[in-house]
From Swiss-Prot:
Residues engaged in binding Zn(2+): 74, 76, 244, 319
Any Gene Ontology biological process: L-histidine catabolic process to glutamate and formate
Native organism: Cupriavidus metallidurans (strain ATCC 43123 / DSM 2839 / NBRC 102507 / CH34) (Ralstonia metallidurans)
Protein name: Imidazolonepropionase
Entry note: cofactor: Binds 1 zinc or iron ion per subunit.
Keywords, sorted A to Z: Cytoplasm, Histidine metabolism, Hydrolase, Iron, Metal-binding, Zinc
Length: 415
């Protein structure tokens, strides 16, 4: 079903329970939502439904819980190919260096992405996006970073925009040119950062393809000084920044991100208290990525106690990518957030709604059920919202409303 052919959600949604935000204390049992012209006009207890809305068409939610649409705030969804062969090599004991020498690793994805045309990239990314939409995702971040040339990065970002237009999902694009060194710049990292800052970013920003700028600040990525150059270039174009930080080591990337008022710092397994304090003071969201932690069989947990102590908002995301987190299930990430990272159910609910929206700089658009917001919400056939994190391998989503259009399970609802 094409997005513009899906039925309208306008009318009164009733026979439901509402969770307007992640806090269970705000739940409304026997609630109702009124949608007019694709936006939420009213919500509350059904018994308090104003008379002015009682004549509108009714949508029976069949006892479902309704939450805000989910937000997947860190993905690398658009790329060529996949790396299952590399996964098998790793399981057989091959090191990262051995895989790279055999032509694997990120270079293989860069090669496949550069070789693919936009139609191919769109078809492959669509197959990854649709399972996320089927789990209630209504807003998603999509990074570039597998092109590593102006032409190929542009191609990734154009496809990301096309996905949003085709599926009616809110796509937030992030330019991640500073993801890795392309083969042609081996040993010349500073020269490549010059290209990123002075050629790629200005051109892509001028074309309206960039909503935010990211970098990979690690020993195997880019240094603090090089990342600083990327952030300064983003500032010249009025773009917010975010950062892959402290995943493999503590270089002080989170503190750097905070100094530049980054909207998020992501991964953070090796984050220390100084970095946590800096993030808290800057209002930077901690985006936790249990899929990559699991897939890499990591043992260093993010410092949850410190993040809680200093009041840093925590988001959860799939980090969908071919090398370290080839998952298309945000619900599974919620379960892993609880079982592996030891988060609470309210924390993971906030992590895929309100806090994930903050991590995109879009808290005014996503992550809450509120009057005057777009009608983006999900119907779940569960007895309690806790079931969203409890189950794994099961999708209890019955229907999704995206931009005021209804997509029901079993009716070609993903598209």
């Amino acid at each position: 079903m094409k997005f513009n052919e899906a039925p309208s959600a306008d009318g009164v949604w009733h026979h439901c329970h509402l969770l307007p935000a992640a806090d269970p204390a705000q739940a409304i049992r026997d609630g109702a939502i009124v949608v007019e012209q694709g936006r939420i006009a009213w919500l509350g207890a059904f018994a308090a439904l104003p008379d002015v809305y009682r004549h509108l068409p009714r949508h029976d939610a069949n006892g479902a819980w309704i939450t805000p649409g989910l937000v997947d705030c860190h993905t690398h969804l658009v790329y060529g190919g996949q790396r299952a062969d590399e996964f098998a090599m790793r399981l057989a004991g091959a090191s990262y260096e051995e895989i790279a020498r055999a032509g694997g690793g990120i270079v293989s994805t860069v090669r496949a992405t550069r070789e693919a045309d936009e139609a191919t990239l769109f078809a492959q990314a669509s197959a990854r996006l649709e399972p996320l939409l089927a789990e209630g995702v209504t807003a998603i971040e999509i990074k570039s970073g597998y092109g590593l040339s102006l032409e190929a990065e542009r191609k990734q970002l154009r496809v990301a925009r096309q996905l949003g237009e085709t599926y009616g999902v809110a796509v937030h694009t992030t330019f991640l040119g500073a993801h890795a060194l392309p083969p042609e710049y081996a040993g010349r990292a500073d020269a490549y950062i010059e290209l990123v800052c002075e050629t790629m970013l200005p051109a892509l920003a001028a074309e309206g393809l960039v909503d935010a700028v990211d970098a990979f600040c690690e020993g195997i990525g880019f240094s603090i000084a090089q990342t600083t150059r990327v952030f300064e270039a983003a500032a010249r174009h009025g773009l917010p920044v975010k950062l892959h930080a402290e995943q493999l080591s503590n270089l002080g990337g989170a503190a750097l991100a905070a100094r530049h008022k980054a909207i998020s710092a992501d991964h953070l397994e090796h984050l220390d208290e100084a970095g946590v304090v800096a993030m808290a003071e800057a209002g930077t969201v901690a985006v936790l990525l249990p899929g990559a932690y699991y897939f890499l069989r990591d043992t260093q947990l993010p410092p949850l106690a410190l993040l809680r102590k200093h009041g840093v908002p925590m988001a959860i995301s799939t980090d969908h990518n071919p090398g370290t987190s080839p998952t298309t299930s945000l619900l599974l990430m919620m379960n892993m957030g609880c079982t592996i990272f030891r988060m609470t159910v309210p924390e993971v609910l906030a992590g895929v709604t309100t806090h994930a929206a903050r991590a995109l700089g879009a808290a005014d658009r996503h992550g809450l059920l509120a009057v005057d917001r777009a009608a983006d919400f999900v119907l779940w056939q569960v007895a309690s919202p806790a079931e969203l994190a409890y189950w794994f391998g099961r999708n209890p989503c019955a229907a999704v409303v995206r931009r005021g259009r209804v997509f029901r399970k079993g009716e070609g609802w993903q598209r």
